[in-house]
């Protein structure tokens, strides 16, 4: 039986990124594979005709490449942390229907998927928690969820496309709280500069009726801007389109590589990595 998704619901906002990940898998098979997205799309009763039509446009295809690179970069950082902390907590912040935690599973880590209760309710139906995995309903801004994470073997926390919707002070408070709760842990997330965040905001601020885009989290130089938040933070960043992959694949045109350079250098689209001190 297929799971029906209605238009203009919270669930619909989860379906479109899922469709994007399926599109990435089809367009850039050598660069990205998300079998979960392909499988889930088949289980869902939803009118994808508009998404399918949009998928033919040049910018939609480049957007799919952006999604692919972001997910790959974050997964690379998760796997890299697990090499030295094999029993770590792998924490997907604002998980939606993303399965990166399970894709990085080494057979020993503990996987936590966090999102709002209505999102987790849908996830439980479509992606029920597996072995060593928990789906946790929460508000990321409320630190009560810290206590639900077993970080005795370390913690790698990651957020994909989440912090654009946070105020700068909310991200700072969350990062400082994580530094207390997860010493020796790492937080990895995507970010962009003010110009890019304003472009992202155009699509959702209208409906949210929020005027002050400037209060929302944006970063140009991660190390110099975020390090002063707390002396325990070790901040680094890489471009998220080409910082981990040169994109020299037949599926990626020269024009898309050119756009990727503009994204990384002009828009400062980046993967930010924050280490919370060292676990002795």
Model-derived features: where do they sit?
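Rossmann-like AdoMet
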Residues: 1-91, 95-138, 151-152
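Short amphipathic alpha-helix with an adjacent loop that forms part of the alpha/beta core around
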Residues: 143-152
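A conserved beta-strand element that flanks and buttresses the S-adenosyl-L-methionine
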Residues: 157-158
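A short, conserved alpha-helix within the catalytic core of class I
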Residues: 165-178
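Conserved beta-strand signature within the Rossmann-like core of class I S-adenosyl-L-methionine
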Residues: 178-194
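Short, glycine-/aromatic-enriched active-site segment of Class I SAM-dependent methyltransferases
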Residues: 198-213
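Short alpha-helix
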Residues: 213-240
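Conserved catalytic loop of SAM-dependent methyltransferase domains
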Residues: 232-258
């Amino acid at each position: 039986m297929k799971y029906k998704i209605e238009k203009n619901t919270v669930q619909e906002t989860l379906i479109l990124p899922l469709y994007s990940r399926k599109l990435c898998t089809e367009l850039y098979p050598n660069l990205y594979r998300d079998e979960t997205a392909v499988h889930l799309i088949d289980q869902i009763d939803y009118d994808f005709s508009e998404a399918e039509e949009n998928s033919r446009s040049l910018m939609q295809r480049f957007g799919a490449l952006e999604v692919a690179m972001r997910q790959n970069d974050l997964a690379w950082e998760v796997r890299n942390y697990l090499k030295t902390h094999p029993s770590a907590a792998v924490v997907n912040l604002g998980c939606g229907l993303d399965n990166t935690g399970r894709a990085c599973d080494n057979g020993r880590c503990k996987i936590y998927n966090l999102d709002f209760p209505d999102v987790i309710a849908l996830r439980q139906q479509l992606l029920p928690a597996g072995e060593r995995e928990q789906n946790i309903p929460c508000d990321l801004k409320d630190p009560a969820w810290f206590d639900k994470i077993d970080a005795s073997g370390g913690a790698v926390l990651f957020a994909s496309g989440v912090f654009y919707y946070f105020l700068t002070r909310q991200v700072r408070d969350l990062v400082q709280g994580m530094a207390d709760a997860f010493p020796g842990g790492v937080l990895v997330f995507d970010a962009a500069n003010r110009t890019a965040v304003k472009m992202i905001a155009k699509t959702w601020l209208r409906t949210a009726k929020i005027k002050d885009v400037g209060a929302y989290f944006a970063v140009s130089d991660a190390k110099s801007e975020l390090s002063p938040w707390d002396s325990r933070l070790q901040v680094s960043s890489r471009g998220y389109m080409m910082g981990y992959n040169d994109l020299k694949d037949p599926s990626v045109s020269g024009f898309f590589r050119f756009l990727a350079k503009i994204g990384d250098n002009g828009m400062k689209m980046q993967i930010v990595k924050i280490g919370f001190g060292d676990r002795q």
